[in-house]
Amino acid sequence: MLPYATAAEAEAALGRAMTAAESLWFRYSAGIPDYVLFWHNILFLFVVFTLAPLPVALLELRAPAAVGPFKLQPKVRLSREEFFRCYRDVMRLFFLVIGPLQLVSYPTVKMVGIHTGLPLPSLGEMAAQLLVYFLVEDYLNYWIHRLLHGEWGYEKIHRVHHEFTAPIGFAAPYAHWAEVLILGIPSFVGPALAPGHMITFWLWIVLRQMEAIETHSGFDFPFNLTKYIPFYGGAEYHDYHHYVGRQSQSNFASVFTYCDYLYGTDKGYRYHKAYQAKMKALGQTEGEKADSNGLSYAKLD
C-alpha cells in the first residue's frame, strides 16, 4: 500500500510529476496492501499455466499435419484425454501446493526488499534485474536438477516430471510436490540478491514460467524469437533430456546451455547432433536406426 493519500502527495514526495506508468500504478495500487499485490502471482500463474500452452496444444490436436514438420518426436501423439489429465493434475498441484506456497511466502519477499512504492524502475533497470534472476536461477537449477537425476532423487521425486518422455507445454509444472518446493528456491534467490519492484517480480515469475512452457512444448518452430537469445537452450535442447530420461546425464540446464558446456554434461547431446548431421549428409541411409518416436539417438548419455 502506497503511503500517499493523493497523487499530489506522491508527486511532492517524488519531487516531480509522475510518469503515465506511475500514475497508472498509483491509481491501481494505492489502496491495496502489499501482501495482496504479491498474491497477484497466484492469478498470474493460473492464467499462464492455463492459457500459455493452449495454442500449441490446440494446433497439435486439431491440425497435426500443419505442425507435424516442427514436432520433435513426431510419432508421439497424445489424445485430448491425456492433455486434459496433465492439466487436471497440474491444477491439483497448483491449488494444493503452488498457490498456498505463494500465500505464505510474502514475509520472505518483504524481508529481502521487494517493494511496491514509487518511483517505478526504468526499463533498463528491470532488464538488468531480470537478467540476474535468470542467470542465478539457471545456475542453481542446473545443480539441483543434476542431483535429482541421482538414483534416490530420481526414483523418489523427479521421475514424476519425466513421465512425459515427449513433453508438452502443460507438463512444464507437472512434477512431484517436493520438486515444486525444491526448485522454487532458485526462483527466489535472484530477487533476494537484487531486490526490485513488485512489477519486476511479477514479470520474472511470468517470464520464467512461459519459458518453461516453451521449452516443454515439444515443437521447434523456426520463427521462435528465443532462437536469437545467446546460449538459450529451447525446446529442442530440453526435448533430448526428456527423451533419454532417467539415464540421461545430459542437458540439465533449465534456460541457458553454458553450465552443461562448462561441466561437460552436454556430450551426449552434441554426439547426437553430430550423428544427425552425418546421417543427413548421407541421405539418412540404412545405417540410421530411428526409434518408435521418430528419433534417432545413436548414443544416450
From Swiss-Prot:
Expressed ubiquitously. GO terms for cellular component: endoplasmic reticulum membrane. Residues 131-265 form the Fatty acid hydroxylase domain. The keyword Transmembrane helix applies. It is an enzyme of class 4 (lyase). GO terms for biological process: sterol biosynthetic process. Keywords: Endoplasmic reticulum, Lyase, Membrane, NADP, Transmembrane, Transmembrane helix. GO terms for molecular function: aldehyde oxygenase (deformylating) activity; C-4 methylsterol oxidase activity; iron ion binding. This is Very-long-chain aldehyde decarbonylase GL1-10. It comes from Oryza sativa subsp. japonica. The lineage of its organism: Eukaryota, Viridiplantae, Streptophyta, Embryophyta, Tracheophyta. The gene is GL1-10.
